[in-house]
Amino acid sequence: MENEKSPILEIKDLRVTYETDIEVVEAVNGISFQIEKGKTLGLVGETGAGKTTTALSILRLLPETTGRIKGGEICFEGEDLLHVDEEQMRVVRGNRISMVFQDPMSSLNPVYTVGDQIGEAIRLHRPELSNDAVEQRIDEILQLVGIMPSRKHEYPHQFSGGMKQRVVIAMALCCEPELLIADEPTTALDVTIQAQVLAMIAELRSRLGTSMLMITHDLGIVARTCDDVCVMYAGKIVEAGTVEDIFLAPSHHPYTEGLFGSIPNLTTKARRLKPILGLMPDPTNLPKGCEFAPRCEKCMEICRMEKPKICGEGSHKLYCHLFDPDRQKTGVGGNTNG
């Protein structure tokens, strides 16, 4: 019983950089989170927040020449993946942990049929299966994602964008992984197809019992698919909690408020969108204090000088000086952007 309650993935104080002869990019700066078995965690943030770098770190697929994991732990089923050899990682990748990337065309080879590509993934991780068993599995997984098995003899260019993404999802799920990482899986799709793919992912997750890390910038996708949420900004997690915490709690990190402010409201014509002013900080020269301070309308003097501590109660955590009980008692701070 105790093992059932343990997280399938736990990341502790992960730090990742990209290093060249000229500069060091601090991409991920000490993030920690966990994914419970059978649950979906949404990792939300703007482009450049460090979401994809986090995903690539889990699979140890960072660029060999520049990517460096500087510290932390990535524990999958209790085993730190940073301390296993490459041969063991090949058993994990695509078999126990799979990933769906943003652009389906970057994951599909145009000169092979989709059936051959799914079959290659199955044979790599299930060498004991006969050819007939592999073909049967290809048919099953295509049916599972809503594609007629007869189309396994077709090439990627014969599929629409939404169907290509279904093929990629089929490849990711063909070995029934315990964890699926979905990196902006619907970004390249129109709204109607996006809804269909999201509904399919949710159904497959429920049917197969697969845990999932959903990487997105879209809070609407988070609301539809996730159980827990981490909001990421400039390599750090600034807010975390259940999906109810993020959408219903009275208090939020100013960055999370900014994300909500940039979502169109279909219930009224009066409210204008309120985009977050400014740009993500230079990752080679991050601010001394809170990374969001230069863009924050509620910025105080302490925000520019000190990193915020973790605040909040229960499952809802905030990394912001506004909610620091010690600051509220002493009155330290003062708005500097007003």
Predicted feature residues:
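Conserved ABC ATPase signature
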Residues: E154-F159, M163
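A short, proline-enriched helix->beta-strand linker immediately N-terminal to the Walker B motif
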Residues: C174-E178
